[in-house]
Amino acid sequence: MQHKQAMQTMALAAVCQAAWLVQQVARNGSCDEESMRCLLQGVLITDPNNAESVYPDRTLLREGYKTLVEQLGNNRNPKNVELTRYVIGMVALERKLSGKRRVLSALAERVSQVKRQAFHFDLLTDTVLSNLAGIYSDQISNLGPRIQVSGAPLYLQQPQVQHKIRALLLAGIRACVLWRQLGGRRRQILFFRKKVIAAAEAALRQL
């Protein structure tokens, strides 16, 4: 049971990290590349042996765990409403996606194409990012209310920044899929918040 909670929390931390990185890119035009790469690699792992193999290096999820603790904790610091909005938006889109077999099939085919492309190009090249962004735009964003990203107009109007943001939203939804597969439900965040925080804090101590 403790291991299951740890894996659910890992997946939720990945969702939070995607939201955090979206915010960084929208505000600054860039973000920590290794933290981003970790999440994008998770998108390409479609048939994992176990949950750990989706995010094998959990040190790269540090910001996600920290964000999870800060957003759910009872600390006096004000919550980041923007991050909460992104997380809720990704969870909602994943729920819409889960019931649409035709969309899931098309999405799987597009991800397979990116996998083949990733043999020849680095994940963070705009060639790959634009294709990941295209998957989000074509297959997912229209399933429900669009996630409105706030940031600096100077950056948000740049195609490369748009590609990064959409690729990260796709990565966040992939993490939502894993979280749900592991038994994660929204009510657990509401009613078992202390357990989630404790698991995230335990993970941070080990990083």
Swiss-Prot record:
Please list every transmembrane segment annotated in the UniProt record, as residue ranges: none
Record carries keyword Isomerase:
no
One Pfam family name is DUF489
The reply on keyword DNA-binding is no
Q: What is the protein's name according to its record?
A: High frequency lysogenization protein HflD homolog
User: Record's GO cellular component, any one?
Assistant: cytoplasm
Q: Which domain of life is it from?
A: Bacteria
Which keywords label this protein? Cell inner membrane, Cell membrane, Cytoplasm, Membrane
Q: Which family does it belong to?
A: Belongs to the HflD family.
Entry membrane topology: Peripheral membrane protein
Organism classification, top ranks? Bacteria, Pseudomonadati, Pseudomonadota, Gammaproteobacteria, Aeromonadales
Which InterPro entries is this protein grouped with? HflD (IPR007451), HflD-like_sf (IPR035932)
Q: Which gene encodes it?
A: hflD
User: Could you tell me which species this protein originates from?
Assistant: Tolumonas auensis (strain DSM 9187 / NBRC 110442 / TA 4)
Localisation per UniProt entry: Cytoplasm; Cell inner membrane
